[in-house]
């Protein structure tokens, strides 16, 4: 599923850009959509990318709280910006997107960490998302 892989990568890039610029991710998403419509060299933003970014935006506080709670030895502010946004995207998809198998979410997040972050990041991302996966039933119950 190369299309889903690309959609995740683009969603991560949108979250990363919003974090770096201090701008809401929905504003960045709108910019990307507008830019793709006005510049034929830019690929369109896929439905799945939009679903991931929009879904994340509805859960941003909860996701940041979970990452802060389970990231042993790291505060959200001290965490590398790349890792923080890979974790944000992975946590959203893991906990709230039922159609994607958990193993796929973890693998894709680790691949993003390998591509965009430090040598230590893949194991950090895998460990934290693995912990959230184990807690997923109780995390979703806490939402109700």
Regions found by a protein language model. Give the residues of each.
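N-terminal interaction/assembly modules
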Residues: 1-144
């Amino acid at each position: 599923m190369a299309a889903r892989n690309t959609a995740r990568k683009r969603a991560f890039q949108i979250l990363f850009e919003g974090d770096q610029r201090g701008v809401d991710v929905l504003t960045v998403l709108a910019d990307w959509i507008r830019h793709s419509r006005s510049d034929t060299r830019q690929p369109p933003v896929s439905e799945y990318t939009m679903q991931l970014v929009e879904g994340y935006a509805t859960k941003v506080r909860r996701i940041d709280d979970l990452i802060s709670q389970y990231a042993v030895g790291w505060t959200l502010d001290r965490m590398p910006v790349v890792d923080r946004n890979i974790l944000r995207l992975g946590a959203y998809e893991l906990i709230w997107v039922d159609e994607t198998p958990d193993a796929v979410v973890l693998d894709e997040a680790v691949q993003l960490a390998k591509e965009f972050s430090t040598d230590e990041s893949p194991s950090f991302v895998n460990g934290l998302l693995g912990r959230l996966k184990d807690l997923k039933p109780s995390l979703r119950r806490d939402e109700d």
